């Protein structure tokens, strides 16, 4: 009978510790790109919806990740990541 291999990798950090570190990193990045009152309202909404629970922590992590991804993708002025307008050819030809 087959058995799953034993875990031979390095021990993982606890999920809660990882989640709090990830949330802290996302918050630090978010305050560089979004207005603080807006982020405060987002945090208040999450707290009102989920209370002080791990589900709330997971929700705000997910929302901040999405917001930052979209922000960078649309062309954050602080980042090299983003959609750059295509340059038009000088001879008038245009590829579609």
From Swiss-Prot:
Keywords: Activator, AIDS, Apoptosis, Cell cycle, Host G2/M cell cycle arrest by virus, Host nucleus, Host-virus interaction, Ion channel, Ion transport, Modulation of host cell cycle by virus, Phosphoprotein, Transcription, Transcription regulation, Transport, Viral penetration into host nucleus, Virion, Virus entry into host cell. Its main location: virion. Homooligomer, may form homodimer. Interacts with p6-gag region of the Pr55 Gag precursor protein through a (Leu-X-X)4 motif near the C-terminus of the P6gag protein. Interacts with host UNG. May interact with host RAD23A/HHR23A. Interacts with host VPRBP/DCAF1, leading to hijack the CUL4A-RBX1-DDB1-DCAF1/VPRBP complex, mediating ubiquitination of host proteins such as TERT and ZGPAT and arrest of the cell cycle in G2 phase. It is found in: Virion; Host nucleus; Host extracellular space. This is Protein Vpr. The modification Phosphoserine is found at residues 79, 96. GO terms for biological process: DNA-templated transcription; monoatomic ion transmembrane transport; protein homooligomerization; regulation of DNA-templated transcription; symbiont entry into host cell; symbiont-mediated activation of host apoptosis; symbiont-mediated arrest of host cell cycle during G2/M transition; viral penetration into host nucleus. It holds the Pfam family VPR. HIV-1 lineages are divided in three main groups, M (for Major), O (for Outlier), and N (for New, or Non-M, Non-O). The vast majority of strains found worldwide belong to the group M. Group O seems to be endemic to and largely confined to Cameroon and neighboring countries in West Central Africa, where these viruses represent a small minority of HIV-1 strains. The group N is represented by a limited number of isolates from Cameroonian persons. The group M is further subdivided in 9 clades or subtypes (A to D, F to H, J and K). Disulfide bonds: none annotated. Phosphorylated on several residues by host. These phosphorylations regulate VPR activity for the nuclear import of the HIV-1 pre-integration complex. Belongs to the HIV-1 VPR protein family. Residues 1-42 are annotated as: Homooligomerization. During virus replication, may deplete host UNG protein, and incude G2-M cell cycle arrest. Acts by targeting specific host proteins for degradation by the 26S proteasome, through association with the cellular CUL4A-DDB1 E3 ligase complex by direct interaction with host VPRPB/DCAF-1. Cell cycle arrest reportedly occurs within hours of infection and is not blocked by antiviral agents, suggesting that it is initiated by the VPR carried into the virion. Additionally, VPR induces apoptosis in a cell cycle dependent manner suggesting that these two effects are mechanistically linked. During virus entry, plays a role in the transport of the viral pre-integration (PIC) complex to the host nucleus. This function is crucial for viral infection of non-dividing macrophages. May act directly at the nuclear pore complex, by binding nucleoporins phenylalanine-glycine (FG)-repeat regions. One of its GO terms (cellular component) is host cell.
